[in-house]
């Protein structure tokens, strides 16, 4: 299932994926992993632990970590992980959600549930405080741009080497590994694998 279809079908829905502890933010992520990424969700703990366990076999098979910095702009389908946050019992929980791709270096939007312990279903929220937030980018993705996506074999190349067609499957192998300034605007590139070759996209 595509990210877009997932949002359309489940926006506003209260998802209790594991039928335990009611509607939790991590339930939405398990649902996302199952429906969109096509993987079997595992229980790894509270929300903040998705980042702390980013190098575990389970997480690293699904995601590539994106450590937040001043150039970071979350992409569609990225999972944000907030390390801060506690429940009513004083237990550290953190928070987690799925980014829309709308935003810049100052704010971003994401779908999440049980924000602030309210028990709400899948709802869109705007985030401006990034102090304890990092991201997990899905390792395997499909090109969503109808016109395709330009791939560059070299960091300093000004001319693209390939046009990766719409709906093609790529593997992200490194995130935010290269930055390029064009007309006073900084663009950040990931490195991917496509048909056995590596490209900056």
Predicted feature locations:
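Short, solvent-exposed aromatic-acidic interface loops
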Residues: 113-117
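Short, polar loop/linker segments at the starts of domains and inter-domain junctions
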Residues: 18-21, 42-49, 120-127, 153-166
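Beta-loop motif signature
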Residues: 141-200
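A short macromolecule-binding patch
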Residues: 118-129, 197-201
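Low-complexity, Gly/Ser/Thr/Pro-rich intrinsically disordered linker/tail segments
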Residues: 132-141
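Secreted/periplasmic proteins that engage bacterial cell-wall peptidoglycan
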Residues: 1-103, 111-112, 171-179
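Short, compositionally biased
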Residues: 91-107, 185-197
């Amino acid at each position: 299932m595509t990210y877009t279809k997932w949002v359309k079908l489940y926006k506003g829905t209260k998802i209790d994926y594991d039928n335990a502890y009611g509607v939790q933010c991590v339930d939405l992520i398990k649902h996302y992993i199952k429906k969109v990424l096509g993987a079997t969700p595992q229980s790894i703990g509270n929300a903040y632990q998705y980042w702390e366990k980013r190098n575990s076999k389970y997480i690293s098979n699904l995601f590539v970590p994106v450590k937040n910095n001043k150039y970071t702009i979350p992409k569609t389908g990225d999972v944000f992980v907030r390390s801060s946050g506690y429940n009513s019992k004083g237990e550290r929980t953190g928070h987690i959600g799925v980014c829309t791709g709308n935003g810049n270096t100052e704010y971003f939007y994401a779908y999440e549930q049980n924000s602030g312990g309210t028990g709400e279903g899948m709802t869109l929220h705007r985030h401006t405080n990034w102090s304890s937030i990092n991201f997990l980018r899905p390792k395997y993705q499909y090109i969503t741009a109808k016109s395709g996506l330009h791939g560059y074999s070299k960091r300093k190349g000004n001319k693209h080497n390939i046009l990766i067609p719409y709906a093609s499957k790529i593997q992200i192998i490194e995130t935010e590994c290269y930055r390029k300034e064009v007309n006073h605007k900084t663009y950040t590139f990931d490195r991917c694998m496509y048909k056995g070759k590596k490209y900056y996209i």
